[in-house]
């Protein structure tokens, strides 16, 4: 199991909605395919005001999927899975999600009817397998989609194909909208070593704000990009103003 970003940044006193992404697929772990869904969802969730806390990449193994989904479901408001929902032998995400919640895998009559209507006489066992769902799961329908999104409690099961993943998420994205993040960015010509103590001081004095420092070695106009972020707009502005006091005024290229 590969986990990215398992540590949590400072949490604002304002309650944040949190999310985890579970990417499922041996092909991702072996380098046969490149995951594009997590990076897309990271950007989308942040724009919606949802704090991503965890990204997990795991193999196509039922028990591993069940354990990861259960853990992420317990610790986050939303969980999004990517991959493992096709008709072949290695598509075991549905079984893993069902096991995470102690449920059986059952054939959903609405999905079966949709599949039979779509494929007609071409329906077979492999295609009908796409109607299998964890018992008690929800089908989320939208006008923009032919096929619904499957949800099991706070877990949203999405396909691994990037085009389909995006379409399905975009159809349901507004249900996740939360209070937005407020971000200010300072670009400075000062070296990161020279501003480190000042950043530490401001971070300590403004615990409700997350401050990031990102040096660059390829730009001529600035050397460090500093981001100040929080759900609380006034807190961001106070931290920004304090940082501007500490930085050499002539070194600040721009503030966004």
Language-model features and meaning:
Residues 15-19:
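Extreme N-terminal starter segment of soluble prokaryotic enzymes
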Residues 28-38:
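Glycine- and acidic-residue-enriched helix-capping/strand-helix junction motifs
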Residues 64-67, 91-176:
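Proline/glycine-rich low-complexity loops and linkers
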Residues 39-92, 96-99:
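N-terminal small/polar loop signature for handling phosphorylated ligands or for N-terminal nucleophile
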Residues 154-246:
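An accessory alpha-helical subdomain
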Residues 246-256:
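Conserved short beta-strand edge segments in small beta-sheet-based binding/regulatory domains
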Residues 24-26, 81-89, 160, 214, ...:
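Glycine-rich beta-strand-to-loop/alpha-helix junction loops that act as flexible
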């Amino acid at each position: 199991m590969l986990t990215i970003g398992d540590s949590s940044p400072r949490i604002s006193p304002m309650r944040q909605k949190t999310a985890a992404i579970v990417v499922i697929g041996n092909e991702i772990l072996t380098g046969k395919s490149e995951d594009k869904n997590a990076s897309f969802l990271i950007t989308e969730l942040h724009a919606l005001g949802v704090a991503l806390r965890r990204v997990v990449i795991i193999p196509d193994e039922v028990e591993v999927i069940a354990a990861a989904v259960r853990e992420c479901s317990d610790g986050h408001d939303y969980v999004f899975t990517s991959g493992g929902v096709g008709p072949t032998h290695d598509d075991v995400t549905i079984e893993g999600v069902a096991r995470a919640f102690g449920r059986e895998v059952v054939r959903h009559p609405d999905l079966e009817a949709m599949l039979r209507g779509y494929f007609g006489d071409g329906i077979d066992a492999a295609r009908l397998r796409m109607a299998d769902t964890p018992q008690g799961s929800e089908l989320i329908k939208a006008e923009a989609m032919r096929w619904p999104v499957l949800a099991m409690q706070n877990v949203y099961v999405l396909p691994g194909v990037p085009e389909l993943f995006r379409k399905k998420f975009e159809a349901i994205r507004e249900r996740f909208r939360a209070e937005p993040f407020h971000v200010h960015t300072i670009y400075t010509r000062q070296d990161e070593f020279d501003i480190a103590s000042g950043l530490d001081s401001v971070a300590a004095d403004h615990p409700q704000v997350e401050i990031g420092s990102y040096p660059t070695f390829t730009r001529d106009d600035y050397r460090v990009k500093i981001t100040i972020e929080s759900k609380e707009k006034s807190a961001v502005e106070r931290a920004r103003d304090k940082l501007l006091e500490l930085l050499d005024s002539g070194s600040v290229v721009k503030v966004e």
